Design a protein with these regions (language model features):
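N-terminal amphipathic/basic-hydrophobic helices that include classical n-h-c signal peptides
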Residues: 1-28
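Short beta-alpha connecting loops at secondary-structure transitions
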Residues: 47-51, 96-98, 304-324, 346-361, ...
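A short, charged helix-loop
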Residues: 243-259
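A conserved active-site cap/scaffold subdomain adjacent to cofactor or substrate pockets
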Residues: 262-295, 304-365
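Long, amphipathic alpha-helical stalk/connector segments used for oligomerization, subunit docking
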Residues: 328-412, 420
Length: 503
């Protein structure tokens, strides 16, 4: 086997050569393989929370917070040592840390050695196990990400409220099984998907309010090493943990954990992210269907191209992306469910490789979904002229349930009325499909049926009323608006958020 010289490897695809940059660790691999979710879709704020360099700084800040608390509680840690660590905190060299890890085969030990060498001291990590560092810092990343996603959720709900209000009285043809059903309004349809997301938003608030951090619990959860450091003084150990939790800014702390916090908590987090994405995904799937009928669209930016082959195409590519993000989140939810209920004794690291991928990428996915969805909500449009033509075509069918109720009120049995209306409706549809008629003449057919005690004028009036009758849709939209208004007042920063430009 002849190995190519470093930097000369080429991949041949249909006779086109693509040179790969040299990787210093392995000359056969490209230098950088990007995280597509982070690089292409996530916002800078989420990228910063989960970046490798950002995490190292968070870990160092955590070590410093522990040292300060330990010193305040009587441990012999010189002030100049803490100052030296603080001075070195932002000097991050991932390559140097990786070189140490290749020797130690232990990521935390490598980062301890790196930080100690930079500061010239050995005072970090006293009485701590690796999970005291990694679990708390990862939970801090999760918690800060949840807060960011909460604010973007408010931005989405704000736009849904505005769009629902804008089109509250625009009557459209509602569809069940994707078949014309009854009149509704576009505002009601938007509020329908908005209320689904509102329910998920309340679940998100609950997760944030009750999110428990692991705290300083030691190797198996008993705080044995911290108790040794403080000569068995349990009050000082609890005080230390309280100070560290205050540094993290978490609402509560686990008491009875082992080496790891329960992975069912990760499942809960990814579950609520998937729940949050479900309403937007259904909305976007429906908007794609509406675009196919030319009744609405997600918008089409100047210079945008729908197809490299078909110049006329204006595809719902952003809505499709939202649906794709939802699929990704459901994949990570499956990963999270695999970890929940799978803990051996006090814990191990079998979950580590899964969580390294699942946690950041789940947040990148929901963040990218919201950035895209906000853009859709800002740029979407509806087309009343096309909607009006669709309504006119289907309106006699859409009002058949009202006709049936009026017939019942006039004394006909419900099932008798149902049977008669169904016979004529199906016959009318079949004649329209076969080209035997070009006009929906259902009203005339019903008027000539003795089983229906309503004359043509009464039937025509019922159908005409359907042009503006969407039941209780307006009141239901108003209820949705009130709920969102209350949330906007609680989170004004979130309501004012504007998305960045999307690819």
């Amino acid at each position: 086997l002849k190995i190519p010289a470093p930097g000369t490897l080429r991949i041949n695809v249909t006779r086109i050569n693509f040179p790969l940059p040299e990787n210093p660790l392995c000359p056969l691999l490209p230098a950088v393989i990007p995280n597509v979710l982070a690089e292409r879709y996530a916002s800078p704020a989420l990228q910063a929370i989960w970046s490798a360099e950002g995490r190292i700084v968070l870990e160092r800040e955590f070590w410093i917070a522990v040292m300060k608390a330990q010193r305040e509680l009587g441990l012999d840690i010189p002030e100049e040592a803490i100052a030296a660590y603080e001075k070195a905190k932002d000097s991050v060299d991932p390559g140097s840390i990786m070189a140490r890890e290749r020797v130690t085969r232990h990521d935390v030990k490598a980062r301890i050695e790196e930080f100690n060498d930079l500061s010239g001291h050995e005072h970090i990590h006293k009485g701590m196990t690796s999970r005291d560092l990694t679990e708390n810092v990862e939970q801090l990343q999760v918690y800060r990400s949840l807060l960011a996603i909460r604010d973007k959720s408010v931005a989405v709900l704000h736009r849904l409220r505005c769009r629902a209000e804008q089109w509250a009285d625009l009557v459209i043809t509602a569809r069940t099984h994707n078949v014309a059903a009854q009149p509704t309004t576009l505002g009601k349809r938007i509020a329908m998907f908005g209320e689904e997301m509102l329910s998920a938003f309340h679940a998100l608030e609950d997760v944030i309010a009750r999110y428990p951090v692991r705290g300083l619990k030691g190797a198996v959860g008993t705080q044995m090493d911290q108790l040794s450091l403080f000569n068995g003084n349990a009050e000082q150990v609890l005080d230390l943990e309280k100070r560290v939790v205050n540094h993290l800014g978490m609402p509560c702390v686990w008491t009875n954990v082992g080496q790891v916090y329960p992975r069912s908590l990760d499942f809960r987090v990814v579950s609520v992210l998937t729940d949050l994405a479900s309403g937007p995904s259904s909305f976007c799937r429906t908007l794609r269907l509406m675009a196919g009928h030319e009744t609405a669209s997600e918008g089409f930016a100047p210079g945008q191209t729908g197809s490299s082959a078909m110049p006329h195409k204006m595809n719902s590519r952003s809505c499709e992306r939202v649906n794709g993000f939802h699929v990704i989140l459901k994949g990570y939810l499956a990963m999270a469910s695999g970890l929940a209920g799978d803990q051996w004794n006090e814990g191990d690291v079998s979950c580590s490789v899964v969580r390294r991928v699942m946690l950041p990428d789940a947040f990148f996915a929901i963040d990218g979904l919201f950035e895209t969805y906000l853009t859709v909500l800002d740029q979407m449009d509806a087309y009343p002229a096309v909607i009006g033509k669709e309504n006119a075509h289907y309106l006699p069918f859409l009002m058949t349930t009202t006709i049936m109720m009026e017939a019942v009120k006039a004394g006909v049995g419900r099932e008798t009325a149902h049977k008669a209306i169904k016979e004529h409706a199906v016959a009318t549809v079949n004649d329209l499909r076969a080209g035997k008629t070009t006009v929906n003449d259902l009203v005339a057919r019903l008027a000539n049926d003795e089983r229906i005690p309503l004359d043509q004028a009464a039937l025509a009036a019922i159908v005409a009323e359907g042009e503006s009758n969407a039941g209780a849709a307006r009141a239901q939209i108003t209820h949705f608006e009130r709920e969102i208004n209350a949330i906007e007042k609680r989170y004004p920063k979130g309501a004012a958020y504007a998305p960045g430009a999307i690819l």
